[in-house]
């Protein structure tokens, strides 16, 4: 929805996060300027991709964000992951505002909140072998040896319905459903506290969907 707004974008006041939630979203907004305001004159025109959204994600719970196509679900996910900067609002992780976290705090947040994206074709680096794609988080965020990482990668591939011997292949050698399973294996590598998923089983065969959901 595109609307005309004043130059000033109102910022909703922050509300304290829930004590029971691992993630709290408060008054979150993401507005994109799509016109107007030329040379500082006139009203700017904004596309309100996300407008005043608030919710809590409790520990050890499954939380679903449901809405029609184009209503802002994927943008909300990107804001949660720090891939987009909010126009206004707050994102809390374990009670702490992510925007004001220390460097160490943000590193812990990135380790603890992983993602699986909807498009398995663009979410994997085509120049990397699967063993590197799945093992990269372990190389960066742990002190595991190469042998331990290789074992962990094999286990993750098995758990997501892939053959560990496929670790030496490249993404283009897999089907779309298999690529999505690689993305899920990568997201599970660090045993995260939160996994944010953008329609994660939409590209999978019916026979594998239940297996993946049970694994998650």
Feature map (PLM): residue ranges:
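Conserved ABC transporter NBD signature motif
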Residues: 89-97
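Conserved ABC ATPase "signature" region
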Residues: 97, 147-165
């Amino acid at each position: 929805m595109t609307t005309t707004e004043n130059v000033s974008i109102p910022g909703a006041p922050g509300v304290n996060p829930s004590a029971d939630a691992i993630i709290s979203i408060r008054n979150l907004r993401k507005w994109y300027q799509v016109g107007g305001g030329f040379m500082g004159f006139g009203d700017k025109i904004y596309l309100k991709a996300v407008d005043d959204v608030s919710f809590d994600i409790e520990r050890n719970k499954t939380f679903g964000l449901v809405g029609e196509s184009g209503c802002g679900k994927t943008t909300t996910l990107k804001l949660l992951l720090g891939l987009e900067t909010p126009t206004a609002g707050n994102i809390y992780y374990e009670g702490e505002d992510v925007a004001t976290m220390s460097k160490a705090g943000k590193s812990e947040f990135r380790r603890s909140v992983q993602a699986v994206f909807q498009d398995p074709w663009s979410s994997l680096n085509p120049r990397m072998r699967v063993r590197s794609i799945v093992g990269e988080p372990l190389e960066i965020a742990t002190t595991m040896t190469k042998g331990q990482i290789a074992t962990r990668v094999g286990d993750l591939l098995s758990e997501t319905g892939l053959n560990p011997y496929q670790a030496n292949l490249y993404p283009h050698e897999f089907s779309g459903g298999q690529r999505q399973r690689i993305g899920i294996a990568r997201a599970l590598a660090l045993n995260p506290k939160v996994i944010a998923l953008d329609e994660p089983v939409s590209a999978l065969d019916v026979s594998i969907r239940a297996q993946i959901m049970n694994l998650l």
